[in-house]
Amino acid sequence: MLAHKASHEGVLVAEVIKGHNRVYDAKTVPAVVFTDPEIASAGMMESECRAKGFNDLLISKFPFAANGRAVSMQETEGFVKMIADKKTHILLGVHIVGPEASNLISEAALAIEMGARLEDVALTIHPHPTLGETMMEAAEATLGHAIHIIQKPLTNGKSAHL
């Protein structure tokens, strides 16, 4: 399930042997489980964030049930969970359970690799209606201004849909 990781590491080793200066950051390697629904993850889990000293976190889940494309596909089970540093809004982890999670996680891996902030993801226009919109909506929810779900107010950095 991590053939993509092994392939990337092989290329990296070959480039280092050739004398190229390369950097490898394992935190951005996406993990995917091809179940129904699919499960995908990139970056850190909440417990890992806290273990690394990120104690003030913004965390939210956006349900696929609130996404038009998921509804039209009758694939509404699951969510996109985002974890970010409360002070900087830098995205630390994304965890997806739901339709096409294996494809959606790539945007999260790129955002984490780039050091993107929640605002970067939230302000990126996503085509409508697509499952990809769940990434934008999850970022908006994590910032506390989702428009397609009713949110409880942010408490202790956590937000949840009602």
Predicted features, each with a name:
Residues M1-T28, H89, T130:
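Rossmann-like dinucleotide/flavin-binding elements
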Residues K18-N21, A31-M45, R50-L162:
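Flexible, glycine-rich terminal cap/loop adjacent to redox cofactors
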